[in-house]
Amino acid sequence: RKFYMSEFDKYIVQGEPDKKAKANAWQTAIGLQDVDGLKTSEYLIKTAVQHIEGDITISQVKDMLDDYYQVRGNREDIEKERTDEADKVSARITEMLLEKTFSFTPDFLLRIHQRLFEGIYKHAGAYRTVNISKKEWVLGGDTVMYSSYDMLRETLEYDFELEKRVDYNALNVDLAIKQICKFISGIWQIHPFREGNTRTTAVFTMKYLQTFGFTVNNDVFKDNSWYFRNALVRANYKNLPKGIHSTSDYLELFFRNLILGEKNVLSNRSMLVFESQSANKEVSKCQNGSLDCSLDELAVLRFLKENPDAKQTDIAKHIGKSERTIKRITPSLIERGLLERENGKRNGRWVVKCDI
C-alpha cells in the first residue's frame, strides 16, 4: 500500500494537470478495493505509472492486465486472493472516473456495474434474481434488510424520481449534504446486484457529485472506502428491541470531508453497534460551522479562491453552468458578504470572504 501511495503522490504534488488527474483516479480506484478487503498487485502499480506518464492508454492497461492473468500460473492463489479482480476493477474505475460522462438514470448505475465487473461476475450489469443477506462486522454479525429482488427496478426508479425533484439551489450546504446522503444510502440499501454494490455506488456517487460543478476530494474515498461501506450499513440498520436506530450521521461526516474538505475523524470502530447503542453519543461533531450557501455557490467560491482573476466565462466553464447562472450567483454572494470584488469590474480580482 505504501508503495503505490509514494509512486502516485509525486504526480499529485508536482505533476501536470493531466498526470495529476490520472494519479488521483488511480489512487481512488485502488483504495476502493478495500471495501471487499482486496489488494492490488505490484504489476498493476507499474502499469498504472506507465499510463500516468502517457506511455500507454487506459485501454492498453486493460489489455495488458487481461494478458497478464491469462498466462500467469498458480491460478488457485490468484482466485483465492482475488488479485485479478482488484487489478482489473481498479483499471476500469480509473477509466470511468476520467471520462466526462454521466446519466442520472438507474440504467447508468447498471452500466457502471457492467463495465466494472464484466468477465469477473457472471451477472455483471444485471439485477439480482434472489433475496440476499450479508453478515456485517459493524452490526456484530447481523444484516441490513435489502430490497426484495422482484421490486428492484421499481424501487430504483422511485428513488431516482424523488431525487430529480430536489431543488438543490434552495438548500444550503448542510441540507444538501443530508439530502445527498439520503439518496445515496437509499440506492445502496436497494442493493440491486449480487456483488459489487458498494464499489458501483461509490463510482456513481463521484460521477454524480461532479455534476454539481466542483471537484470533490476523492482522497476521502481512497483512504476511507471501508468506512463508507460501514456508514451505509448504519444508515440502513435499526434494531428497536436493542435500542438501535438507523442514523446517517456517520455518512454525513464522510460527505462533509468529501465535499467541504473537513477533517472529521472517520472511525470504523465508533460505528460498532455493540460499542454504544446511542449513535448521537458516538459521532464526532463536524469541525466547520454551517456555510449559508448552495452547492453551486460553494463551487463558485472554491473556484474563485483558487482563481481570483477569473472571468464570468471561466467560472461558467469550470463548474458547468451557464454564464447567466453565474451572473445571478456572484451578486448574491457579494450581497451576503461571502464574496468581494476589488478594484472594479474590468481589472479587479475576486476575494472570497469566508472560510471554505
PLM regions and their residue ranges:
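FIC/Doc superfamily catalytic core
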Residues: 1-356
